[in-house]
UniProtKB/Swiss-Prot annotation:
UniProtKB keywords: ATP-binding, Cytoplasm, DNA damage, DNA repair, DNA replication, DNA-binding, Nucleotide-binding, SOS response
Record's protein name: DNA replication and repair protein RecF
Matches recorded under PROSITE patterns: RECF_1 (PS00617), RECF_2 (PS00618)
Entries under NCBIfam families matching the protein: recf (TIGR00611)
Record flagged with keyword DNA repair: yes
Any one of the GO BP annotations: DNA replication
Binding site for ATP: G30, P31, N32, G33, S34, G35, K36, T37
Compartments, record wording: Cytoplasm
């Protein structure tokens, strides 16, 4: 799967751009603040309905413009599709697929599986459990057709339960919510556990290449004691939940814990090693998707050279090439990505929001 063409209008500092893209590596080179990351963010937004640097649509719409518009041509298994997304300052979102309106953002995410590697991506390792839940949920979303609807319903029900906790005095008054929550919670936890077990070998193998000096271990924590029945636990903890005014246990508290030599990775690894581990996790997840479904991810790498020495950059470049996936890489100079440049690559020069193809020597 590859994005063959990208049109950007009034997104960040980019007034207008129409890019014919390479199926392999696409390099975005230019000084800091030129708009390189904005191109990556436009691609990410086209596949997620939101930017990765801001959750507020108004902040990514170009100054004094009413909306941004993104459009792409997607080549998926020799079938070409068109996808489009626009967002106004009022928050109105329009999704178009193959010329028809009324589609959901989740459909874009299904069409355009992406792995994002940014300097802020360390939160996967040193941020809270929600970032590692998101890692598992990306895999469940792309591997389990019923996951998205189940998780959306569970989040809605938990929100309603938490609101009810502020008003009720007896457990019987919220039992109706729990009767709907329990089967969803158990199903989602089973999907997450199955996915973490299935991908464990891929993660271990990739991490062994990137960080052979450490013995890494991974464990899924479902969000409540594995020996406890979730329904009974919700009833037992009602008084506590009512005092807290939120549901303290469940899939929304799950985690995917990562240790190196028995120690949490954020307490042991350097920033360069953490970046390698983050890259290994993203690569392993993308390769697992390809093996399971035949679909390839898009890989988006922002500020590629930061935290990595020449040898580590070369190793990452080799592993990315081996995926045969489409890759977008931003860097300050062409020299930083010299190890990645090949016959299927394309170099773009970005300055002041203007993007031009740069001939390769």
């Amino acid at each position: 799967m590859a994005l063959t063409r990208l049109l950007i209008k009034d997104f960040r500092n980019i007034e207008s751009a129409d890019l014919a893209l390479a199926s392999g590596f696409n390099f975005l080179v230019g000084p800091n603040g030129s708009g390189k990351t904005s191109v990556l963010e436009a691609i990410y937004t086209l596949g997620h309905g939101r930017a990765f640097r801001s959750l507020q649509a108004g902040r990514v719409i170009r100054h004094e413009c009413a909306e941004f518009v993104l459009h792409g041509r997607v080549d998926a298994n020799e079938r070409e599709s068109s996808v489009g997304l626009s967002k106004s300052r009022q928050g109105d979102t329009k999704v178009r697929i193959d010329g028809t309106d009324g589609h959901k953002v989740a459909e874009l995410a299904q069409l355009l599986p992406m792995q994002l590697i940014t300097p802020e991506g360390f939160t996967l390792l040193n941020g809270g459990p929600k970032f590692r839940r998101a890692f598992l949920d990306w895999g469940c979303f792309h591997n389990e057709p019923g996951f998205f609807m189940a998780w959306s319903n569970l989040k809605r029900l938990l929100k309603q339960r938490n609101a009810a906790l502020r008003q009720v005095s007896r457990y019987t008054q919220i039992r109706a919510w729990d009767q709907e929550i329990i089967p969803l919670a158990e199903r989602i936890s089973e999907w997450r556990a199955a996915y973490s077990d299935a991908i464990a070998a891929d993660i271990s193998a990739t991490c062994a290449l990137f960080l052979p000096e450490f013995a890494l271990s991974f464990s899924f924590q479902r969000g409540w004691d594995k020996e406890s029945d979730y329904g009974e636990l919700l009833e037992r903890q009602f008084v506590r939940d009512r005092a807290l005014t939120y549901t303290a246990v469940g899939p929304h508290k799950a985690d995917f814990r990562i240790r190196a030599d028995g120690t949490p990775v954020e307490d042991l690894l350097s920033r360069g090693q953490l970046k390698l581990l983050m890259c290994a996790l993203r690569l392993a997840q993308g390769e697992f998707l390809t093996r399971q479904s035949g679909r390839r991810c898009l890989y988006l790498l922002d500020d590629f050279a930061s935290e990595l020495d020449t040898g580590r950059r070369r190793l990452l470049a080799e592993r990315l090439k081996a995926t045969q996936a489409q890759v977008f890489v931003s860097a300050v100079s062409a020299e930083q990505v010299a190890d990645m440049v090949g016959e299927k690559g394309k170099m773009f020069r970005v300055e002041h929001g203007k993007i031009e193809v740069q001939p390769q020597d």
